[in-house]
Each structure stands twice: as C-alpha cells, then as structure tokens.
Amino acid sequence: MGKRLLFAWLAGLAPALAGAPLPVEEVAPGVFVHGGAQEETSAANRGAIANIGFIVGSRCVAVVDTGGSLSVGRGLREAVRARTALPVCYVINTHVHPDHLLGNAAFVGDKPQFVGHARLPAALAARARTYLAALSRALGPAAGMTPLVPPDTSVQDTLILDLGGRRLELRAWPTAHTDQDLTVFDEQTGTLWLGDLLFVERIPVIDGSARGWLQVTGALRGLPVQRAVPGHGPVTVPWPAALEAQERYLATLVEETRRAIKHRLTLQQAVDSVGLAERGKWLLFDLYHPRNVTAVYTELEWED
C-alpha cells in the first residue's frame, strides 16, 4: 500500500476506532502530560509506559510523543479533543523508541507535521520490523495493525514551532540516550520535555553513548527551565535536581567499567560486578542494567 493510500485509510479508520481519553494532568497552563506506567509494555498497559502529552496554543496543538501502540495514540488524541477543538498541527517525536512513537498513526487524520531529529527516519526504518514484532508479542491480538509513521520534518540543530502566541524550541542533541534525542522547550511556561534524556525512578537505558549522555546532561543543566517532563517517572520533576540520580548512575558505570577494562576483566566479569551498588535504587534494574554495562564496556573498550 502506498504511503498516501495508507494515510487516507488510517484517516478514515481513526474516528470509528476512537476510545476513551487517556488521563492527563495539566502541569502548567496549556501543558498536559499523561504519566506512563513504570513497567514493560504488556497487554494490560497497551504500551502506555512513557510520559506523553500535548501543548495548546491559540492557533493549534503540538503533541509530544504518542505512546507505545496505536491504541494509546488514539487515547491521547481523545484527550486532546476533550480539552480543545483546535487542530493538531504538530506531532513531535523525541526519539525512536517504540513507547514514544507507535501511536503516531492515530493523528494522521489531523494532517499535522510529524517532527523529529534528522537521524530519526533512518533509525526507525532500521528497527521497524523488530519493534512491530515485539509489540505483537507483548500485546497479542490487541496490537492490531500499528503502522509506523516517520517524521516528515527534521531537526538538524534547533527549530522554532509557533502554536499561536506560544513558541516551542526543539533542539537536536549529540548522541546520548540514542543518536536522535530531541527536546521540546515551551518558552511560555519554561517547561522542558526531555524525552528519554531523563529517567526518574526507572533505570536509564543506554542506546547511544554513556559518555555522550553525561556531556549532554552538563549542557542541559544550564538551561533556564522552570519545570521538566522526563520520559519516564513523575509527570514533572524539580530542575536541575532531577538530573542527579541519573548522572550518578551513568558516571558510576563509566568509572567502574573503565576500571574493569584496565584490570582486564572480561565482558561477563564486568556485567557481574559493575554498578551493583545501584541495585535497589532503580525500577527494572535487573532487566536493563546488564545491557547497560555491556553497552558501556563496548563503548570504552578501545577508547584512547
């Protein structure tokens, strides 16, 4: 099916399949966030495991991430419609991970611009089949048909979006959590949407560079932010104090992995010993920490 025909089909299907609105919290005037479950995707949560939401201007609405399934995206769209009749003009994806963008197709009928980091389309194309297979395993029949909708507007450095009396600054970052991380800053309220550049309570996941993430964290710390919306955790967190636990975890991994390599520990020995003092401080630690150590070991093994 061609892209144009697929979009037309989705646009016609969406109203018929609209469900209940996702619950959202207004964390600042015109800024609404749905708090994702601190879990892995399952049939019970439908992939609603990330913080997603929308910002309302005087002219239109920008959606920031759309959730981990078409069903979640539809619920978010219904939440928008429950609060405003203004059109959705932008759907912004903060990075490639499926819990943040598999709901994009729910908004195709609104004919928005889909916006993401310049490297997002290639990353999504490379992982599409894997993501959809994983969704089918997790949700079973509830996964249904979840078409992937890539961005049609890319951010190389920064981009300003005007919602009507309300400007959003989008910024593309160097490799950190992933190699396509994007933040969204609402100038009116000083609210910074970080995507997965910030995990709170749930263990950070390294799919880019631990060293790069620490460098980006230093740059983020200096931004004039009133409140922050992390990709996972409470819907808003104090700034910049919320960065501290994640920064400690990443720095610990880098320091201890570097020491393990210096002492000629194998990868498995590093996985079995690095960062274990962090257990008990993070949700899903046992699931993701070994992967993180593996990623950092690979990153540092041949560093100069």
PLM features: residue spans?
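Active-site HxH/HxHxD metal-binding segment of metal-dependent hydrolases
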Residues: 74, 78-154, 158-160
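Divalent metal-coordination and catalytic microenvironments
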Residues: 30, 55, 65, 80, ...
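C-terminal regulatory/interaction regions
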Residues: 262-304
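Hydrophobic h-region of N-terminal signal peptides that target proteins for export
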Residues: 7-19
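Metallo-beta-lactamase
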Residues: 21-27, 122-173, 178, 187-188, ...
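Divalent-metal (often Zn2+) His-rich catalytic cores of metallo-beta-lactamase-fold enzymes
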Residues: 214-265
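Conserved beta-strand hairpin/beta-sheet module of binuclear metal-dependent hydrolase folds
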Residues: 29-79, 182-194
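Active-site neighborhood of phospho(di)ester-bond hydrolases with catalytic His/Asp-centered motifs
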Residues: 64-66, 89-96, 115-118, 173, ...
